[in-house]
């Protein structure tokens, strides 16, 4: 049904670790490994779910679309690009469209990027590039062209993040705001 489909892949209005309580209850009743799902993209939440015995494994779907290096980054103690549970990826798939991710512009375009890399295609270097706007798109572009180039980002606001940052002020969009610290760390690496 539509209502159960909407909850099966919990959107940002649902709490982190949406189904962890169910997994924990099941784990106490069975003698086989239990995997839990649903809004476990925060590394601390995922690790705690296994360490406290609520589940034997955590399944990561959308978090790996947001950051394919999620597991390796967590193992190295690095900041991950957090899935904000906006379900852009899910909505597109349900419509038969190309997979997309609001926080990872490469998602759904991996083949294009891999093919360009395989062919040795590189961006021109030695350029002075101006990027207007310090939202996710502008920052992602700036990062993509920064190697060998001088990139200057122009942003009218005092803080980077664009409308993406402001979305966190809306009720039930707190994950967008939670993503602002990784966004600021990303900016620092440019």
What is each model feature region?
Residues 1-132, 136, 140-151, 159:
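Flavin-dependent oxidoreductase catalytic cores
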Residues 131-190:
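Beta1-alpha1 glycine-rich phosphate/pyrophosphate-binding loop at the start
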